[in-house]
């Protein structure tokens, strides 16, 4: 039987919705035996926003739901959910007992999406469904490596042994009896708590099972482990599939990548605003104000106004003295760690425009480093493990959100005739641009809804995977290296794909209403 692996990248609601579109189209494609291509997906790896889509799909399978019901259910959640808004409001409530926003998010996820379901619910049913392997991925900070919440069937290896994926990682392995108590809401939160937006989730302290007296001995034996967004080390979810391939054959690996693909150059705009104000001049202004209040005391008659002026004078004196003393203490401490002499009084004459530039340029460059340079480098390294490995030749597809955006190059492996068929229309490029403009958030803004980003993202997931499967089939016609009889199942879809691609070119959103597919 043909075995397909799919990884669902991170990217907040942008990713979750794009992946929903991808899965819905795989469900639309009917193979020669009448089964949807989605039923041949046996391995799922997810990151951050992609974990919502993947977990919901897996959980629905375990509950015996049809593909149609699973996908339409997630469609409703993504379009109507206000989890972040509700969590923020309730977290700021003075009566709220949760010590962190991410814990409040877990509570809301549990109430509104996963309804108290646990990994144990999936473990009990994994042998009865079409999914053999599932891995929702987070990052643990102690060893700067992946932390996998895995559920899988016991697989016989090529060497004759038996293997099942590790829950956790090589440094921290979670016993199955503990793992089955972990809530799906906690898995999603751990995989998607991105730095800057949320606090780290500490294992096992922040997990619900830690409160059960039965687990006290285990909880006390584990040193708290900080866990955050899986996209920090692998935003495409590639590594778990590489590891699974060592245990079993994979005929096709679809990397569903919801990165927005922006390539804006790094810039920092300098401004002349506040260029006439420095700390020294601010001190002079403060001194003038203090002198002014002191002078008023000589002319204001005794009574209410005397008290008011006296209070204002005292407040300004306290502020002035506090700033002077704290600055002196800070400079003295800092000077001890600097190996050269420096006239620190010169700093007082630097205007605030320069200070803004000094601080702003460093802050924006750090953000650019982590959010762009670092993430792009990690992405390249992860893709290299697939595209530089001959064992993956003709067994991989990158399904990227930004591929068909305006100005992107595409189809370099196609013949001129194939390029004519595959060329995206203006309507397709416009839709892709709208979809790719969605930020990495866990909510829709009013503007997002007005512009139609939810529908644009679903459509982008659908026509991108249609386009990429068709390109894959065209390439296989010229080179069948490393393929088997199992790949004929995919090649037989060519006619369906060509017909749908022509419809997408006319109306990119003709399948965007999930309930009508």
Role assignments for model-derived ranges:
Residues 1-517:
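Catalytic domains of lipid- and phosphate-ester/thioester hydrolases
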């Amino acid at each position: 039987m043909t075995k397909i692996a799919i990884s669902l990248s991170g990217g907040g609601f942008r990713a979750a919705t794009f992946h929903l579109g991808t899965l819905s189209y795989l469900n639309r494609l009917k193979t020669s035996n009448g089964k949807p291509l989605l039923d041949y997906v046996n391995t799922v790896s997810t990151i951050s926003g992609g974990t919502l889509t993947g977990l919901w799909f897996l959980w629905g399978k375990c509950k015996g739901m049809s593909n149609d019901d699973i996908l339409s259910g997630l469609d409703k959640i993504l379009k109507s959910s206000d989890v972040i808004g509700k969590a923020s409001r309730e977290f700021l409530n003075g009566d709220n007992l949760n010590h962190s926003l991410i814990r409040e998010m877990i509570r809301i996820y549990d109430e509104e999406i996963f309804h108290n379901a646990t990994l144990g619910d999936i473990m009990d049913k994994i042998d009865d469904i079409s999914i053999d392997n599932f891995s929702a991925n987070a990052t643990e900070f102690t060893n700067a490596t992946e932390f996998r919440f895995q559920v899988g069937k016991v697989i016989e290896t090529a060497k004759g042994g038996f293997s099942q994926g590790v829950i956790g990682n090589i440094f921290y392995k979670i016993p199955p009896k503990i793992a089955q108590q972990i809530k799906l809401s906690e898995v999603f939160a751990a995989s998607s708590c991105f730095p800057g937006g949320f606090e780290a989730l500490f294992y096992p302290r922040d997990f619900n099972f830690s409160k059960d007296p039965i687990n006290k001995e285990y909880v006390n034996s584990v040193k708290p482990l900080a866990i955050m967004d899986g996209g920090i080390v692998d935003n495409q979810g590639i590594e778990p599939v590489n590891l699974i391939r060592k245990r079993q054959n994979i005929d096709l690996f679809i990397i569903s990548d919801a990165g927005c693909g922006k390539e804006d150059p790094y810039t920092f705009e300098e401004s002349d605003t506040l260029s006439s104000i420095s700390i020294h001049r601010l001190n002079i202004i403060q001194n003038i104000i203090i002198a002014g209040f002191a002078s008023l005391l000589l002319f204001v008659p005794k009574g209410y106004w005397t008290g008011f002026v006296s209070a204002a004078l005292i407040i300004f004196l306290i502020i002035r003295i506090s700033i002077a003393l704290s600055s002196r203490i800070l400079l003295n401490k800092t000077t001890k760690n600097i190996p050269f002499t420096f006239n620190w009084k010169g700093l007082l004459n630097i205007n605030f425009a320069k200070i803004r530039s000094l601080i702003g340029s460093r802050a924006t460059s750090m953000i650019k480093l982590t959010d762009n340079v670092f993430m792009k480098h990690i992405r390249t390294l992860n893709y290299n493990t697939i595209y530089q490995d001959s064992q993956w030749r003709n067994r991989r597809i990158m399904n990227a959100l930004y591929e068909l955006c305006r100005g992107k190059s595409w189809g370099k492996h196609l013949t001129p005739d194939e390029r004519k068929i595959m060329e995206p229309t203006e309507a397709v490029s416009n839709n892709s641009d709208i979809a790719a403009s969605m930020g990495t958030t866990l909510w829709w803004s009013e503007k997002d809804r007005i512009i139609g980003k939810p529908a644009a993202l679903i459509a982008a997931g659908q026509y991108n995977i249609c386009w990429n499967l068709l390109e894959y089939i065209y390439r296989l016609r010229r080179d069948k290296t490393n393929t088997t009889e199992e790949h004929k199942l995919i090649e037989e879809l060519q006619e369906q794909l060509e017909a749908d691609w022509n419809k997408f070119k006319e109306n990119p959103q003709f399948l965007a209403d999930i309930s009508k597919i």
